[in-house]
Curated annotation (Swiss-Prot):
Its cofactor is Mg(2+). This is Deoxyuridine 5'-triphosphate nucleotidohydrolase. The lineage of its organism: Viruses, Varidnaviria, Bamfordvirae, Nucleocytoviricota, Pokkesviricetes. It catalyses: dUTP + H2O = dUMP + diphosphate + H(+). Belongs to the dUTPase family.
């Protein structure tokens, strides 16, 4: 199995290179480059001050850290990092709780999971094939 190489550039002295907690961790932790106050029921764009060069066959998906979600009611807003994006990685940090959340420089705020890109072709058709499930969604297959 060949390894893909993701190149990382720090855009400031406050940036931290992403790390994995263990060899089997799917995601690489992302770190805040600055201090932030995230008020209850609000969101903040948290800068990491890193830029990435992701291989053409991949993209990066920003995901929440389970402990922040469970213990602090923190969510991460949609985050897909395309392979051709070269700007600073920012994380949409959402506080769904009733208390302010303080982020300190160097805190782990999210994780990035590198996934293989499916190269598909989109074709318009007038009818789709039938399935047992049909158009039933949102819990129709069981909870």
């Amino acid at each position: 199995m060949s390894k893909f190489i993701v190149y990382v550039k720090k855009s400031s002295e406050f940036a931290t290179i992403p790390t994995r907690s263990s060899k089997k961790s799917a995601g690489y932790d992302l770190y805040s480059a600055y201090d932030y106050l995230v008020r209850p029921k609000s969101r903040v764009l948290v800068k990491t001050d890193i830029c990435l060069s992701i291989p053409d066959e991949c993209y990066g998906r920003i995901a929440s850290r389970s402990g922040l979600s469970l213990n602090n009611s923190i969510d991460i807003g949609g985050g897909v990092i395309d392979g051709d994006y070269r700007g600073v990685i920012g994380v949409i940090f959402i506080n769904n709780g009733n208390s302010p959340h303080y982020i300190k420089r160097g805190d782990r705020i999210a994780q990035i999971v590198f996934e293989r890109l499916a190269n598909v072709e989109i074709k318009e058709i007038s009818n789709l094939d039938c399935t047992c499930r049909g158009d039933c969604g949102f819990g129709s297959s069981g909870i």
